[in-house]
Each structure stands twice: as structure tokens, then as C-alpha cells.
Swiss-Prot record:
The keyword NADP is annotated on this UniProt entry: no
Lineage: Eukaryota, Viridiplantae, Streptophyta, Embryophyta, Tracheophyta
Gene Ontology annotations for the cellular component aspect, listed alphabetically: chloroplast
Name of the gene encoding the protein in the UniProt record: TPPD
Function: Removes the phosphate from trehalose 6-phosphate to produce free trehalose. Trehalose accumulation in plant may improve abiotic stress tolerance.
Name this protein carries in UniProt: Probable trehalose-phosphate phosphatase D
GO biological process: response to osmotic stress; response to oxidative stress; response to salt stress; trehalose biosynthetic process
Keywords of the record: Hydrolase, Stress response
Similarity comment text for this entry: Belongs to the trehalose phosphatase family.
Amino acid sequence: MTNHNALISDAKGSIGVAVRVPNQSLFSPGGGRYISIPRKKLVQKLEADPSQTRIHTWIEAMRASSPTRTRPGNISPLPESDEEDEYSSWMAQHPSALTMFEEIAEASKGKQIVMFLDYDGTLSPIVENPDRAYMSEEMREAVKGVARYFPTAIVTGRCRDKVRRFVKLPGLYYAGSHGMDIKGPSKRNKHNKNNKGVLFQAANEFLPMIDKVSKCLVEKMRDIEGANVENNKFCVSVHYRCVDQKDWGLVAEHVTSILSEYPKLRLTQGRKVLEIRPTIKWDKGKALEFLLESLGFANSNDVLPIYIGDDRTDEDAFKVLRNKGQGFGILVSKIPKETSATYSLQEPSEVGEFLQRLVEWKQMSLRGR
């Protein structure tokens, strides 16, 4: 199963619209009960009308990012037995990383594991207020343990400084703004073969523009109850998790209206969040490749990257690993989703359990030498 990002230019508004458009539904014909928007239909809609249709299309995308087990409109929910069959089918393709732990451990023998972790929905639960997305002390200890044995990076859409304050662990690599702002440990790190600090910022020239857009969005969203604008330095996130669904159209309208004045910025979408980013070719997959190179593992066969994430933006990293045929992507999700990940975990608590098992396995391996 493969996702495709269609970068569609709205000629009138000059907005780069990055929409994840599956070529087919989640399951093969005969099982396709999870609805996806056909690529051709979505492109036609975007081209047909440079104003209202664009907004309607984004509302569809916003609804699609709020997964449900019921069909849209007046179609009744799926029978429980059908849900179970579809979930079983999905799990057969993306089995639990806990169940398959021994397989993962076997694949890592003789190789250096490098761990990549998303933050929201992976290390911390998804919460209504993004400023209160704290990770538990148990999770912090699990990440600390992993970082003791393996190079570990936090790769997030958040501002790098903010997520570092959440995680509170030195010795990690932090990649904020979807990998556009990367900084490694300030001290020499035993995992870094090059023994030099890592600092990379892919879009410095966009900072004044991003700041201006952020301030405009704060003003525009002031009267929409529940809307939250977050300046993540190299991108801006507009959270609508707490916005009444009847106001989603107004959120999309404000965002696209402001963005029409900035052709060098594009609009993407995650879990109940719209994100404004520079139109550069950089994402979490590029960040993963950059960090592997910085760690001295470019084109190395002795490395096993593991990337754990829950959102659409993590798919770029999953695809890199799948295309390289090296390492594993692990999707955090309780429901079936199209993904390039190899394995799955249901929620952050399972992520913590997986990390702890990895630490215990490494400790046993060292004792057995």
C-alpha cells in the first residue's frame, strides 16, 4: 500500500496545496470500507474553483484526519464483525512491534540501531491543549534508557526548543519543524562517529515570513472558539481539535486566505492540524537521512534505523526506510490507516513498553558477551 502526496498549485491563489491522495482505498476491492478521496476527483475539485471548492476540499481533508469507524453522511456504522475482520486484515500486514519483537531483535544483530521518535501521539498522548502535551516520567526513563545504548533523535513538527523542554533529556538529537531545524548534543557523543556537533537549519530565509504569517493567523483565529495557532519557528500549526466542526470551514477559509499572499509557503495537514511550511523539499524523511549521514551511517549496511510515529508527516520517514529496504517504520495507531510502516503499536504506552524491551534486550546482549 502506497500513499502519494499530490502537490497541486492553485493558480489563482498561488497556494501550494500538499494533500495526501491515495490512488485506492485502504483495502483491496471487496474490502474497501474505509473511504478515501480518489486522486482524480480531488484534483478536479481543486482545479474547478479557486475559492469555495478549495475550502470545501480542505474541509474534506480535515474530516479525513479525524478517523472514525463509521461511514460518512447517512451511512450506518460498520457491523462489529466487519470492523474486526478489517482490523485483523490490517494487523496481518502491520503486526504489533511487541508481538514481533524477537524478529526485530534478530534483524538488528551485528548492526547499530538508530532510534527516531515522533513526539505528540508517540511519546506523549494527544491532548486538547498542545502546550500541555507532557510525556510521563516512565516514558522519559524509557527514552533515556534507549539513548544510553543507541543514537536517538526526536523528530517532530514542534519547535525544536519547545519539544526539548518537554523531553528534558540531554544527549539526544532534536529535529523540530518537521526536520527543518536539527541540533545534536553539544557535548561529544559516543554514538557520533564524526565527533562533531550537528546543527542544521534548512529554511532560515523563511523565518521573517513564517513569523508574519503566524501573527496574522493569531489575529484571524481570535474569534474562533477552540482554535490554537502555534509558531513552530520554521512552520506554523493551526490546531482545530477543539473547534466545533461547523467552524472548520472558517478555519480553512482564514488559513487559505492568508496563504494566498505567500506563494513560497504551502499548506499541509496532520491530525486535526493545518500546517504552513516553506515550499522546500524537506521533510521528516530527509531529516532521517541527514541524521544518519551526520552519525556516519550514510550508505552503511551496518545500521538498523527504527522510526516510530503516529502522524501523516511520519510517512515520509517510513517511505525512506521502505525504499531503502533498511530498518523499520512503526506506526502508532488504534485504527487501520494507509501506511508505509512495517509494524504497528496502538498507543504511547505500547511505545514505552517497546522501548523498555529494547533496553532490556540490549542489556542481556551485553551480559552475554
